[in-house]
């Protein structure tokens, strides 16, 4: 008779969870950050608020963002004027959009990842879907399963309303799923559309304006599995360890509340200061087993909550400017796409490494770190091991 121990050993993979493919997608509507204040104050009928507009212009100028992509077009907003007011009941209109559009955008990214992976989608055993908005039953995970034509027996996990740290969370979960289920191939999708947070400006709620200056829409998908099939699957990064922690004295630093008016966004404390003050502790805990203490010896993927967070982390850790180059590039080209950001950066790092002819997928380096920051304040830390690039 077979023992439980023997069953468990047979169920577990041999090697570490590995990223096997990455795909990204954005809505077609691209907005220029330099002209966005004019558009935003016009579409929200707020042009008379000249001082507030000047303040918003400064926020956009300091954001280090060149452009963003948004599902919301001028036509859609004109058809839904309640979304353009500051605090008008508008949740129904917002929900009607995102419950359809979030799975659709996720499908675009997932289709690209599956194509790169090169295996039949019937081999996908698990689906992890993450989005900040559009809570529904059955959820976006179910809708995506139908849109992609995945097997009805695919094992699904739906993550709603986690926020900006969740790009790290999905990797942590995918790692556990892949390593504890031999032969598992996990499709991870983060799809974010900021239609739930868009609203007109207010003098009394400047943190909402910060969100209007930073957030963009995008979806990213990755396929994770252990023990890649030689000559069939092409490993990109190994997921070595993953941790989550709540930062001390950070209650209420970032809050989001789903109300009749949509998702309201609140910044209550010095978020960049809290993150930069605590980040070295997370690094030390993650890299002590590897005997790594030189943070410039790593390749970096950090959620770009905003330029101030990146600047303070860079200063606190003494990072060379090129360490956060890929992170800053994604912020500049797409804005803050919440959970999808770090997966876009992961894609950028491996592409840039290949383009520049470097010897590994991680900018020529062996070890890397991926950070997610978000409400809580919650920090996700993922240790990555790059893969050698064969010519």
Curated annotation (Swiss-Prot):
Q: Which Gene3D superfamilies match?
A: 3.40.47.10
Family matches, as CDD domains: CHS_like (cd00831)
**InterPro entries for the chain:** Chalcone/stilbene_synt_C, Chalcone/stilbene_synt_N, Chalcone/stilbene_synthase_AS, Polyketide_synthase_type-III, Thiolase-like
Instruction: Give, as in the UniProt entry, the pathway in which the protein acts.
Output: Secondary metabolite biosynthesis; flavonoid biosynthesis
Which residues does the Swiss-Prot or TrEMBL record annotate as the active site?
164
Keyword Isomerase among record annotations:
no
Which reactions does this protein catalyse? (E)-4-coumaroyl-CoA + 3 malonyl-CoA + 3 H(+) = 2',4,4',6'-tetrahydroxychalcone + 3 CO2 + 4 CoA
Keywords, comma-separated and alphabetical: Acyltransferase, Transferase
The entry's note on the tissues where this protein occurs is: Expressed in fruits.
| An annotated Gene Ontology molecular function | naringenin-chalcone synthase activity
The record's Gene Ontology biological-process terms are:
flavonoid biosynthetic process; polyketide biosynthetic process
E.C. designation(s): 2.3.1.74
Keyword Transferase assigned: yes
Please name the PANTHER family in this protein's record.
CHALCONE SYNTHASE 1, HYDROXYMETHYLGLUTARYL-COA SYNTHASE
Q: Tell me, in a sentence or two, what this protein's role is.
A: Polyketide synthase producing naringenin chalcone. Can use p-coumaryl-CoA as substrate.
Known partners and oligomeric status: Homodimer.
Give the family per the record.
Belongs to the thiolase-like superfamily. Chalcone/stilbene synthases family.
Name of protein: Polyketide synthase 5
Name the gene behind this protein. Answer: PKS5
């Amino acid at each position: 008779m077979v023992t439980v121990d023997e069953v468990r050993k047979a169920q577990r993979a041999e090697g570490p969870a590995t990223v096997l493919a990455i795909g990204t997608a954005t809505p077609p509507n691209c907005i220029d950050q330099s002209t966005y204040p004019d558009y935003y104050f016009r579409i929200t009928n707020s042009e008379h608020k000249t001082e507030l507009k000047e303040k918003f212009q400064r926020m956009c100028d300091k954001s280090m963002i060149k452009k963003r992509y948004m599902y919301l077009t001028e036509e859609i907003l004109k058809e839904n004027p309640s979304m353009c007011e500051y605090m008008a009941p508008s949740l129904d209109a917002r929900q009607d959009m995102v419950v359809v559009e979030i799975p659709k955008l996720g499908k675009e990214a997932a289709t690209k990842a599956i194509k790169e992976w090169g295996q039949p989608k019937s081999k996908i055993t698990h689906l992890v879907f993450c989005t900040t908005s559009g809570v529904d039953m059955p959820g976006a995970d179910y809708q995506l399963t139908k849109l992609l034509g995945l097997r009805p027996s695919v094992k699904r996990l739906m993550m709603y309303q986690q926020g900006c740290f969740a790009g790290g969370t999905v990797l942590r979960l995918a790692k556990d799923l892949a390593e504890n289920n031999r032969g598992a191939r996990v499709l991870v999708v983060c799809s974010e559309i900021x239609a739930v947070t868009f609203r007109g400006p207010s003098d009394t709620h400047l943190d909402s304006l910060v969100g209007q200056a930073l957030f963009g829409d995008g979806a990213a998908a990755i396929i994770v599995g252990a023990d890649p099939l030689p000559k069939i699957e092409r490993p990109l990064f190994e997921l070595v360890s993953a941790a989550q922690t709540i930062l001390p004295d950070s209650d209420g630093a970032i809050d989001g509340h789903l109300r009749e008016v949509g998702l309201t966004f609140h910044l209550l404390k010095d978020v960049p200061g809290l993150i930069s003050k605590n980040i070295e502790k997370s690094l030390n805990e993650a890299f002590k087993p590897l005997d790594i203490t030189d943070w410039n010896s790593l390749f970096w993927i950090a959620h770009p909550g905003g330029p101030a967070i990146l600047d303070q982390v860079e200063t606190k850790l003494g990072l060379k400017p090129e360490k956060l180059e890929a992170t800053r590039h994604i912020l500049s080209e797409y804005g803050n796409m919440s959970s999808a950001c770090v997966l876009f950066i992961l894609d950028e790092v491996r592409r840039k490494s290949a383009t520049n002819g470097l010897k590994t997928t991680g900018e020529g380096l062996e070890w890397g770190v991926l950070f997610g920051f978000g409400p809580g304040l919650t920090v996700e830390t993922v240790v990555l091991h790059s893969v050698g690039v064969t010519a």
